Amino acid sequence: MARRLFLLLLAVTAGLSLTGTTVRAVGINWGTEASHPLPPSKVVELLKSNGIVKVKLFDADPKVLRALSGSNIGVTIGIQNSMLKSLNASVKVAESWVHDNVTRYFNGGNRVRIEYVAVGEEPFLQSYGNQYKPFVIGAAMNIQNALVKANLANEVKVVVPSSFDSFLSESGRPSSGHFRADLNKTMIELLSFLTKHHSPFFVTISPFLSFHQNKNISLDFSLFKETAKAHKDGRKTYRNSFDLSYDTLVSALFTIGFSEVDIVVSKIGWPTDGAENATSLTAEAFFKGLIVHLEKKTASLPRPPVETYIESLLDEDQRNLSAGNFERHWGVFTFDGQAKYNFSFNHKNQVNAQNVQYLPPKWCVVNNNKDLSNASARALEACAVADCTSILPGGSCSGIRWPGNVSYAFNSLYQQNDHSAESCNFGGLGLITTVDPSEDNCRFSIQLDTSHSSSQTPNFFQSWPLLLLFLLSGLF
């Protein structure tokens, strides 16, 4: 063990001269899983006005890429997991994808500064099993070959975002870090590919999930508080959760022979709703601590990430909830581009999205003059298809009582369906009002008025776990 620790120390110390001691850039993830997404042109204005110089996308939406043209923002475009099998099977499919989603944006004066193609979105997530893993390396190779054929391989690098659970240490000590046993062979293949083509290793670091899943990780330790109890590993002392996870990854890379690969933290964040300690105050404390920590020269990070991408720009009311109700609340900004807390990318004041177009100031609430014996059942129906995560335990609206929480559910469906009168019927129990029913910190939102509105109900099978939670928690 002592020899292994010594070799690991040599490896990370050697990296000091290769990567420097400060983070090169902080970017942000821009997801679009929203029923009423903020128009891409508004989002690009938001990025530029807040000094955000890099953005990571989860797909290659033409509307988004057109909005980014000429912005000089560094862009990572994503390939969804559902495409991996076909990309692995056919070079022609990969060439077609590169032509449609990369090459066309390099032509003309308003080009998009595409820097990376991310093959898959955390395809090694443990809950996926072998659903995507067999196709990842082949898909990445075919995309790489397609970029070579298009004469773009020197400008655009191929990467594969790895999940927070792809590496671990059963003992909790970073020096014992390793990749999951079922991933070892795949990781060696992936890292060999990345090293050959001078591409970085993209990976999620999640102090928030570490805090929620590990009773030995305190909130203060997660938020970079100086008062946090330190964790020791041999002679090394860890004073925050980020360093603990990051060095576990460094050790895992060293263990399989890739200690010098550049690391990009492709996702790191703290949600503001949907779970205990998921608040604007804790998110602000986390990000301020993170940025200060990444910017300062510190011996605790001898090989800092070359880039870091915050999760995420905006809240998204259509995100899958399998990981938790907080999934729809990662945004630094609300769904309509309004800052949730004081945090700056460029050491200046935050700038909100400007001239946002909303639906008229109307809400749907429960009609207290009706027989409400069936109101709870109607609220459950609404929450099966609309976003009600804020009224679940730990949410920002969990404190409002019945029938206020019923009104919240009614309004969520009403807003999602663009104020259609039918969506506020609920068997005669709904009432459309122009009086804002918001209570204290519980905001009854008005949706965006945008031509990009989907006005559709989410897949019920995506929402049924939330419905089950409502039934079990007895909120209604």
Curated annotation (Swiss-Prot):
Active site per database record: E122 (proton donor)
Residues bearing a lipid moiety (GPI-anchor amidated serine): S453
GO cellular component terms given for this protein: extracellular region; plasma membrane; side of membrane
Disulfide bonds: C364-C424
GO MF annotation list: glucan endo-1,3-beta-D-glucosidase activity
Propeptide: 454-476
Keywords: Cell membrane, Cell wall, Cell wall biogenesis/degradation, Disulfide bond, Glycoprotein, Glycosidase, GPI-anchor, Hydrolase, Lipoprotein, Membrane, Plant defense, Secreted, Signal
InterPro entries membership: Glyco_hydro_17, Glyco_hydro_17_plant, Glycoside_hydrolase_SF, X8
Full protein name: Glucan endo-1,3-beta-glucosidase 9
Catalytic activity: Hydrolysis of (1->3)-beta-D-glucosidic linkages in (1->3)-beta-D-glucans
EC category: hydrolase
Modification comment: Contains two additional disulfide bonds.
Homology family: Belongs to the glycosyl hydrolase 17 family.
Predominant subcellular localization, coarse grouping: secreted
Signal peptide: 1-25
Topology in membrane: Lipid-anchor; GPI-anchor
Residues the record marks as carrying a glycan: N88, N101, N184, N216, N277, N320, N342, N374, N405
Subcellular location: Secreted, Cell wall; Cell membrane
